[in-house]
């Protein structure tokens, strides 16, 4: 889908670049496949802010997307493509031959009327699902499982994809968008193709108010605060903070490594950080 720009009638319109969603379905989602969604405003169950700068925004209903795709060897027809406010990608409403409806992540080049299927050995075409071990090397995939049968977890954002670059016994070597190469079990399933809406990365929000519609509140800099509020606060006149960047709680930020999951280190063949050096 193409990008839309607008006549500069206001400063916000001048900067605004949006994805043209005119080809998507314009009605409401299927009620049986939606759930209510409460806005937390960044607060936990005790009412304390646990995530800063969240709150407000347009009310949203959650579309229950099928990330497992475990209905094997039952063909489904794409009924329509829809917008989903809960994710950057578009979703597709599919109807299985037995009459069941489901939402799936829409891959690129999937059109209304197309037939898709999940199975152990299926055609390599966008929207079809099969175990990674049965896919040819070089296949572009998305919505990849990390644990067998848990449902897709990798490559689900707009425009993302991974590529199968090799095999190692029971495992498949997958190269992710970040450049990381990791081992995934061959019985884990993936969906063929890249995720829809690749132009999302080229959009411009245009104005602060649009971010408020999305539920994001203004982000305050530490150097603009008082010493009681932030380690970078205070000082006479404008200062740069005077120390290495830290969070409001004094922990190093901007580049400090936080990964501690040693048990899965053995599955990472090439770190995304090593690729940049």
From Swiss-Prot:
Stored PROSITE patterns: RIBOSOMAL_L2
Keyword field contains Transport: no
InterPro entries according to UniProt: NA-bd_OB-fold (IPR012340), Rib_uL2_dom2 (IPR014722), Ribosomal_uL2 (IPR002171), Ribosomal_uL2_bac/org-type (IPR005880), Ribosomal_uL2_C (IPR022669), Ribosomal_uL2_CS (IPR022671), Ribosomal_uL2_dom3 (IPR014726), Ribosomal_uL2_RNA-bd_dom (IPR022666)
GO biological process, one term: cytoplasmic translation
GO MF term set: rRNA binding; structural constituent of ribosome; transferase activity
One annotated Gene Ontology cellular component of this protein: large ribosomal subunit
Sequence segments annotated as region (Disordered): 222-265
Keywords: Ribonucleoprotein, Ribosomal protein, RNA-binding, rRNA-binding
Xref: Pfam families: Ribosomal_L2, Ribosomal_L2_C
Superkingdom of origin organism: Bacteria
Protein family per UniProt: Belongs to the universal ribosomal protein uL2 family.
Assembly and interaction partners: Part of the 50S ribosomal subunit. Forms a bridge to the 30S subunit in the 70S ribosome.
Role description: One of the primary rRNA binding proteins. Required for association of the 30S and 50S subunits to form the 70S ribosome, for tRNA binding and peptide bond formation. It has been suggested to have peptidyltransferase activity; this is somewhat controversial. Makes several contacts with the 16S rRNA in the 70S ribosome.
Name recorded for this polypeptide: Large ribosomal subunit protein uL2
Species in which this protein is naturally found: Bradyrhizobium sp. (strain BTAi1 / ATCC BAA-1182)
């Amino acid at each position: 889908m193409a990008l839309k720009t607008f006549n500069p009638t206001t400063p916000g319109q001048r900067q605004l670049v949006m994805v043209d969603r005119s080809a998507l379905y314009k009605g409401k989602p299927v009620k049986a496949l939606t759930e209510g969604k409460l806005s937390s405003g960044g607060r936990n169950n005790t009412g304390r802010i646990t995530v800063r700068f969240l709150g407000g925004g347009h009310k949203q209903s959650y579309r229950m997307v099928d990330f497992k795709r475990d209905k094997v060897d039952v063909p489904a027809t794409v009924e329509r493509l829809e917008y989903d406010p809960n994710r950057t990608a578009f979703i597709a409403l599919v109807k299985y031959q037995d009459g069941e409806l489901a939402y799936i992540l829409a891959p690129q080049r999937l059109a209304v009327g197309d037939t898709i299927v999940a199975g152990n050995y299926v055609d390599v075409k966008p929207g079809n699902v099969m175990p990674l071990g049965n896919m040819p090397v070089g296949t572009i995939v998305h919505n990849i499982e990390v644990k067998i049968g848990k449902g897709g977890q990798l490559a689900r954002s707009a425009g993302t994809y991974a590529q199968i670059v090799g095999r190692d016994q029971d495992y498949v070597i997958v190269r992710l968008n970040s450049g990381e190469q990791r081992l995934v079990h061959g019985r884990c399933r993936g969906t063929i193709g890249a995720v829809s809406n690749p132009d999302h990365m080229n959009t411009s929000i245009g104005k602060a108010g649009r971010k408020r519609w999305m539920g994001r509140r203004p982000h305050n800099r530490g150097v603009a605060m008082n010493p009681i509020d932030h380690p970078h606060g205070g000082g006479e006149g404008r200062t740069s903070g005077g120390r290495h960047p830290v969070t409001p709680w004094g922990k190093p930020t901007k580049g400090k490594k936080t990964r501690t999951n040693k048990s899965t280190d053995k599955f990472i063949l090439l770190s995304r950080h090593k690729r940049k050096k």
